[in-house]
């Protein structure tokens, strides 16, 4: 039991170290197998990132009576904490899908670390939409907005990592090479549980609607990735996380506004 608990803690630290800028203990170490086992905890990283964003929002809202400024501070905190890890994937995918005519062209463009017009526009639009959704929710109920931050970060990561259960990897290089390994059903079940729990704070009906929307988007994006690339890449997972996060915020805003 204690050995299993220690291994779970180590896996959680590995997930935190991979997806955030938080320093991890040197004793944790790193291995591909360890990162694969850590996949179940990726949504818990979303809990951490969302909580950091909620805390930044709360602190900012105590200093200035402007929800828009507090939301911007919240978003800045999450970007700093993650190093814009998923936004980078969104930008790479936008450049690749927007500028490539074949799967090889798209993958080549996505490997280029430089950002192009499609990538810049995609990231700007995603950040603007996220800011607007959160600001609209915060203007109605600040507590709901903070809860939505945690729910959106957790659920989006839980749904994005599920591609490792069902889709093949299109290339064997890039940031996500270590994590883009087949995911076991047990790990997927844990990831789904960790990703879905925060949604229940908005009620069972709202959570069910959010999950249904995410599943539909997951199916559509999965087909698109397969048709355009022949599989998924780490950048695709970043794009998916960003899309899923926006969809969760959209559903939660619609629910709390009705």
UniProtKB/Swiss-Prot annotation:
Catalyzed chemical reaction(s): alpha-ribazole + adenosylcob(III)inamide-GDP = adenosylcob(III)alamin + GMP + H(+); alpha-ribazole 5'-phosphate + adenosylcob(III)inamide-GDP = adenosylcob(III)alamin 5'-phosphate + GMP + H(+)
Primary residence: membrane
Cofactor(s) the protein requires to work: Mg(2+)
GO biological process terms held by the UniProt record: cobalamin biosynthetic process
Membrane topology: Multi-pass membrane protein
Listed InterPro entries: CobS (IPR003805)
Source superkingdom: Bacteria
Compartments where located: Cell inner membrane
PANTHER family (UniProt xref): ADENOSYLCOBINAMIDE-GDP RIBAZOLETRANSFERASE
Record function comment: Joins adenosylcobinamide-GDP and alpha-ribazole to generate adenosylcobalamin (Ado-cobalamin). Also synthesizes adenosylcobalamin 5'-phosphate from adenosylcobinamide-GDP and alpha-ribazole 5'-phosphate.
Protein name, UniProt field: Adenosylcobinamide-GDP ribazoletransferase
Organism: Ralstonia nicotianae (strain ATCC BAA-1114 / GMI1000)
High-level lineage: Bacteria, Pseudomonadati, Pseudomonadota, Betaproteobacteria, Burkholderiales
Gene: cobS
């Amino acid at each position: 039991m204690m050995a299993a608990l220690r291994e779970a803690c180590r896996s959680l630290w590995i997930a935190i170290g991979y997806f955030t800028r938080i320093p991890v203990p040197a004793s944790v170490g790193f291995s591909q197998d360890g990162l694969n086992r850590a996949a179940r905890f990726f949504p818990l990283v979303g809990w951490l990132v969302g909580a950091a964003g909620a805390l930044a929002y709360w602190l900012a809202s105590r200093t200035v009576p402007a929800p828009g400024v507090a939301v911007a501070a919240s978003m800045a905190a999450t970007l700093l904490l993650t190093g814009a890890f998923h936004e980078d994937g969104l930008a790479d995918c936008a450049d690749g899908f927007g500028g490539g005519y074949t799967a090889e062209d798209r993958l080549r463009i996505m490997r280029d670390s430089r950002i192009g017009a499609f990538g810049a526009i995609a990231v700007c639009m995603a950040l603007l939409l996220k800011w607007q959704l959160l600001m609209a929710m915060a203007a109605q109920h600040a507590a709901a907005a903070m809860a939505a931050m945690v729910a959106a970060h957790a659920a989006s990561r839980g749904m994005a990592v599920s591609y490792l259960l069902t889709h093949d990897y299109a290339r064997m290089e890039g940031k996500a090479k270590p994590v883009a390994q087949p995911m076991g059903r047990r790990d997927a079940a844990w990831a789904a549980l960790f990703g879905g729990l925060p949604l229940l704070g908005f009620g069972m009906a709202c959570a069910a609607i959010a999950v249904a929307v995410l599943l539909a988007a997951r199916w559509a994006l999965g087909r698109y990735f397969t048709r355009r690339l022949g599989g998924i890449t780490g950048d695709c997972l970043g794009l998916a996380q960003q899309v899923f996060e926006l969809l969760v915020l959209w559903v939660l805003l619609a629910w709390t506004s009705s």
